[in-house]
Structure formats: structure tokens, C-alpha cells
């Protein structure tokens, strides 16, 4: 049983400096390494299906499966925010502001998180647990609701149309 390094780094059991399970935390919790998955790179591929999985999916035994990474790490990669001078902001139910770095960063006040993207890069950022509420507020206060209603559209549809009309990278912003 295995887990990719980025997901492992989100568990609270991971030592970001050794990029392995943290011995002190394991000792404190009474958890052994054998109870935890092996940590692998997100690009690790495996093949092989159980007979039941093969029958249910119709996939060939040699179909490769890649471990991947957690969504926050991949969002930085997806928008090209892989350097320290580029920030990724993602908004969904929750939201986060993240920047990639070539070394782990520890916030002594524990305001920021730091997770591994892979063995050479980390993502440092701050979470917001109400990203959807922020979008709702912006749509309800910045979109002309009368105009939206006259076009038989919701304020959210209009907000998304405005966002979609801005070319990617306009003034350095990717949305």
C-alpha cells in the first residue's frame, strides 16, 4: 500500500525535511511504519488489476496507473506557478493562495501550510475555508442583478462570463 509524497505531506505524520514519516510523531502516536503506506513519487506508475477490477472496467492488465498528487500541488503545476515569483490562487468551496519553493518553509506561528509537490519542490500557502462564500459575495455585490435578470441569467453566470472573457495571463492573472 502506497501514497504519493504530496498526499503524505498533508497528513501531519510527515517530516518535510527528511521527506519521510516523522519518527517522533510515530512514537508519540504509537503508530508504526508498517501501519503507514510506502511514500512514492507522484510520477510512480504501476500496472496490474485484480480480476474483479479488470472485469468491471474492461481495462487491460498493462494499463498504467499513476499515483499523481493532491489537488493543491497540482493546481500550482497546472497554472504554471512553479517558481517563487509566481502565485497560484484557487477558489472553490475553499480557497488557497500558494507559491512554489525549492525548500521547505516553516511558519513559526503556523499560519501557513507547506506541502511537498515532489522531492525537489514544496508549495507554501494559506487556506481560506469559505472560497465559495467569497465568490457568492462578489457576484451578489459586483454584478448588476437587474441586468442579469433581464437576460434571464443568474449573477453567477454573468460573473463567470466576465471571468471567462478575460484572456489567461491578462496582467499576469490566471483565473
Sequence positions of predicted segments:
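Active-site core segments that coordinate phosphate-bearing ligands/cofactors
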Residues: 1-3, 7-8, 12-30, 45-47, ...
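A conserved helix-loop-beta module that forms one wall/lid of the active-site cleft
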Residues: 30-41
Amino acid at each position: 500500500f502506497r501514497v504519493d509524497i504530496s498526499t503524505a505531506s498533508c497528513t501531519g505524520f510527515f517530516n518535510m525535511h527528511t521527506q519521510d514519516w516523522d519518527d517522533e510523531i510515530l512514537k508519540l502516536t504509537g503508530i508504526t511504519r508498517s501501519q503507514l503506506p510506502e511514500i512514492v513519487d507522484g510520477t510512480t506508475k504501476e500496472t496490474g488489476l485484480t480480476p474483479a477490477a479488470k472485469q468491471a472496467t474492461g481495462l487491460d492488465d498493462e494499463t498504467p496507473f499513476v499515483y499523481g498528487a493532491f489537488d493543491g500541488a497540482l493546481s500550482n503545476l497546472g497554472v504554471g506557478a512553479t517558481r517563487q515569483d509566481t502565485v497560484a490562487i484557487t477558489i472553490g468551496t475553499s480557497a488557497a493562495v500558494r507559491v512554489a519553493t525549492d525548500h521547505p518553509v516553516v511558519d513559526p506561528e503556523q499560519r501557513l501550510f507547506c506541502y511537498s509537490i515532489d522531492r525537489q519542490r514544496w508549495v507554501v500557502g494559506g487556506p481560506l475555508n469559505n472560497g465559495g462564500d467569497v465568490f457568492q459575495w462578489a457576484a451578489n455585490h459586483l454584478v448588476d442583478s437587474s441586468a442579469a435578470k433581464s437576460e434571464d441569467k443568474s449573477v453567477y453566470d454573468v460573473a463567470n462570463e466576465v471571468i471567462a472573457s478575460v484572456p489567461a495571463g491578462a496582467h499576469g492573472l490566471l483565473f
